[in-house]
Amino acid sequence: MIIPKDKKWVQVNGSEVMGNLWASFNIDLSDNYGRLRIGQRLIVNTDETDDADIGVPVAFASINSINYCIAGSKVFKSGANTPNSNFTEDAISGVPTNLNSLYSDMASFNGYLYVSANSTSVYKTDGVSWSSFSAGSNTGSPRLFVQYADRMYMTDGNAKIISWSTSDTPATSGAYTLDLSSNADTRRITCMRASASRIWIFTTNLSGGKALVYEWDGASTQPTRSYRLESSGAFSCVIKDDIPWIIDANANLLAWNGGTFQYITGFNRENHKLLTGIFSTTNDRFVHPNGMSIVEGNIHILINGSNNDNTGTIEDTIPSGIYEYQKEFGLVHKYSFGLTKSNGTIVDFGQIRISKAGALSELNQPSTSSTRNGTFLAGAQIYTNAGSTRNVISYDDQNSTLQKAGTFITTKIQSSEVTEMWQKLYVGVKKFLNDNDKMIVKYRIEEVDSTQISCTWTSTNSFTTTSDISAYANNDEITVIQGVGSGKCAHITDLSESAGTYTVTVDETFTGATSQTFLAKIDKWKKIGSLSNRNASYLECPIGKSANWIQLKIWVTFTGRKEEIETLYLVSAPNQFAK
């Protein structure tokens, strides 16, 4: 059996058997169609270790060759228009200092950059100076922007929209305003976007019913039309080819088809739990209103994959980070936030679990700088250990300067008869470019739910935990999901227990691990082979097990852009025939 058949990798989501990818983490299927590469590492541009005032980055924009960001109460700007140019606080006279990541927004209009605060003031800059004016009367709720025709529109309160023209004179009632507040809890505005001929207004229903999407001409006092969603809300939107694409409360990707919002695909919620923050009255949800962007022509979505439960559990199929959608291969996890800066030591391969999701924006500006790097900026609040957080502004390492890692899990491969003897697996790869590059191959023939555990590093290859892991043993798998080592897998070589504390030794080295706390999950995946030989073009992995299905998992570290997994060859023969 050859995987993928017809050289086409596909992640359907919502099925264990359709397509050939069940789960992905840092996987790039668009860089070389038909081959599987690793998504470029997200490098930290600026974080709280550079400036303690940085909050969650929730908006990015560019004006006059300067990139701007709202992160907490302050405006930050870069020294150049490239994504890897570092951010510092804007210190020009009049710059606002009363912003809030839960409420504020940023957008360009009429040659200026407009910024909303948690007040009735609106601020604007041309990159040289700042000024402000009063608009609206409500505070304590998101003040979201959308520019349409020759006006800027802003939410004022939970269910009202005001606007102003190039003269910055606000219209607060009548023409060019909209008031949906007759039943505000069922029409709470979450996002606005403009296409060529209309404004799209997205809402959430906090009363538990279905939400509505409104179409508006920007001038009338009533919406042009309304459309009912099959969920309680829509939280983020991007316009592609003049069509709105949205993420709804069920973590589904929907697109306008001319008559309704049609289901395209969704995040693979194995346990059907809702994701974090869907009942929030601010912008603190699993996806931010500014969390979708068109990057190099494709839809990208930044999410917090944590479930909306007491402990914020995370499923194997929904790691946090940035996903890419294409019709050809579906919705795939491509990038994850990490702790590493461009000149720093690599101590993780991406945080599977994050605290808060922020903004995502393509800012692929032309530059002749020899150090230019990145095509987009992304913001989040991530974890540095089992509990501490750090706000980060990150960019994608399109120069492929740093090592990265990724994982994929195939769908269940069914036997051709009642049971199959799964004999061996060959994995074809492009020859490695670096001595530190590596591939580890695993399988399972029975499904056991993973266990999330809280741990403390004691060395670079050992840790302790008071979580009950008595059901696990040598050769079982550990994946760090939060803190130092996140995104890396290892297998147990020694496990002992004393007075309720387990001491675990693993077969991989976790650089930077000393005595930090971290979160991990433990599984029953069985390791069947590893490859680190730069001259090898394939790996042979013996299996020798009989079952009615098999699932494969591969974890790799690559350094260069063009390293890739080419093809899987699964060798098997029927074992038990149906008679």
Please identify what each model-predicted range represents.
Residues 35-46, 394-408, 448-454, 519-524:
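Short domain-boundary/entry signatures in modular proteins, especially
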Residues 4-10, 78-86, 90-92, 118, ...:
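Non-cytosolic beta-sandwich-type ligand-binding/adhesion modules
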Residues 85-94, 131-136, 171-181, 223-229, ...:
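Beta-propeller fold detector
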Residues 52-61, 96-110, 137-150, 182-196, ...:
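Repeated scaffold domains used in trafficking and secretory/extracellular systems
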Residues 449-524:
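Small/polar beta-strand repeat architecture
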Residues 50-52, 94-98, 134-139, 173-185, ...:
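Surface-exposed ligand/attachment interfaces on beta-rich extracellular proteins
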Residues 1-96, 102-112, 116-128, 151, ...:
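N-terminal beta-propeller domains
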Residues 357-411:
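Blade-level signature of beta-propeller repeat domains, shared across WD40, Kelch, NHL, RCC1
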